[in-house]
Amino acid sequence: MDLQKDIKKLVTYGLDKKLIMPEDEIYTINQYLEVFRLDEYEDPDIEGEEITGEEIVLPEILDRLTDTAYDRYIIKSDDIVTRDLFDTKLMGILTPKPSQVIKEFRTYYEESPKKATEFFYEFSQDTNYIRRDRVKKDMKWKVNSPYGDIDITINLSKPEKDPKAIAAAKNAKQSSYPKCQLCMENEGYAGRMNHPARQNHRIIPLTINDRKWGFQYSPYVYYNEHCIVFNGQHVPMKIDRAAFTKLFDFVKQFPHYFLGSNADLPIVGGSILT
């Protein structure tokens, strides 16, 4: 019954955050029954309990459900990578299809670009793609220097792998799909020991310089509303006149944001992160 109660709470969270509609409730419960290899379900009495979808509740529910999955041998290991793969699968069941998210984003955009990004940023947190509980652990402070104040940040949102997870990732079958951790192919991907799960990840398509691009948020939030804008095709990074055209094309569409560009040198990366 505790498992059924946690399933009910997770579904109630999805309803509260409008990730699913009331018409989706039974369907969603049945999806979770399949995951946990249950053949039947009795609606538990959870009246009077705090199940309003507050962010502090979600990690607790997911932790308990993941513990149950380990106890029932649904997942074979209890390391952080395996746990993240599993709880992302759970959240993927609650996450609307890409077409639904895009439609809602564009509806908000007609009101204002800012409303559209506010919706999408909140959505990316509600689906646990951006893990609020981990982002809260990040350390940030300012240091005085002869050159002005320097922002120092220690990002703790990205979990450290334990030795077992590192060994499992090393021994995992190598794959070239998705081609990288940012590209379009990640949307909805189940993940593996050496690649994060992205069932709860959604991408907003944009037209930048007459080409298909994607817009998403970083799950690790190095900066406020830290977003990523990326080419729909895998092409080498190149800083030229067209690169500046693309930057300005984006800020014309989203004038409340600013955008930087990675260096076009191998491995260097860069952007505003340097």
Predicted features and spans:
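Helical scaffold of the NTase/Pol beta-like nucleotidyltransferase catalytic core
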Residues: N200-I204, V235-L259
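Coil-to-beta-strand transition motifs
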Residues: Y222-N224, F254-H256, G270-S271
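Histidine-centered divalent-metal-coordination microenvironment in nucleic-acid enzymes
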Residues: H226-N231, D264-T274
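Short Pro/Gly-enriched beta-strand edge/turn motifs at strand-loop
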Residues: N186-E187, F258-G260
